[in-house]
């Protein structure tokens, strides 16, 4: 059985330099570059990837689907540039795809914030569905966070994948700004409006209960300061996306027109 590892990326050159040499055991690596300006495409090509270019779509699933379409393997493992597969994955994946009736496999992921593995606060095991038969799964294209849809039974891998999404706070805030903007767009498209009820939900109730659940009930406090940081911004996500929704609605042409001051009558 052939295995294709598919990756999409935008300005991920440092991660690619570290990640790609660890994946030489795959049949092929398909890298889709999304308008990078840091040399990511050239580095991926130098390190042996089959390289393609696509627009940097905010709906990441569109380019994930494109990467799968370019792959030639019977099996696909989708990987983000900031993820790592420990050495034990090579033997485990090669073994399971040679002798299985499953259409896909889940695995656990260890999320690291600023170099710290977060074991609590709903951050682990953070189960992901990543290994699948090419002809038995697809990414929906409606939403950036929609999961892989699989036609068939799903197994479980034994080893944990590593995830290093945030190396520092500045990087976190940049991604936080991006994803809250995307989520605000989905709120708008799904018909959510600025009302008293929604304001109470998004600015008070949702943040309060999210923080309570993840920091206290799920033990996020046991991960120290990184756990507190994660829980606070996880709760603030609701607040920021709702204010961005307000801004989007306010800046529509019809609302801008209604907010424009009437010209004063000439004397």
Task: Indicate residue ranges for each PLM-predicted region.
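Cell-envelope/extracellular polymer assembly enzymes that use nucleotide-activated donors
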Residues: 2-4
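Short, well-formed alpha-helical segments that are part of the catalytic scaffolds
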Residues: 7-25
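A conserved acidic beta->alpha catalytic loop
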Residues: 13, 22, 33-43, 56, ...
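Short, structured coil segments at secondary-structure junctions
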Residues: 25, 47-48, 127, 150
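Short acidic donor-binding/metal-coordinating loop in glycosyltransferase active sites
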Residues: 34, 56, 73, 80-83, ...
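Conserved donor nucleotide-binding strand/loop of the catalytic core
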Residues: 41-70
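Catalytic-site signature of metal-activated, phosphate-bearing donor transferases
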Residues: 61-68, 75, 86-252, 267
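Compositionally biased, intrinsically disordered low-complexity segments enriched in Pro/Arg/Gln/His
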Residues: 261-265
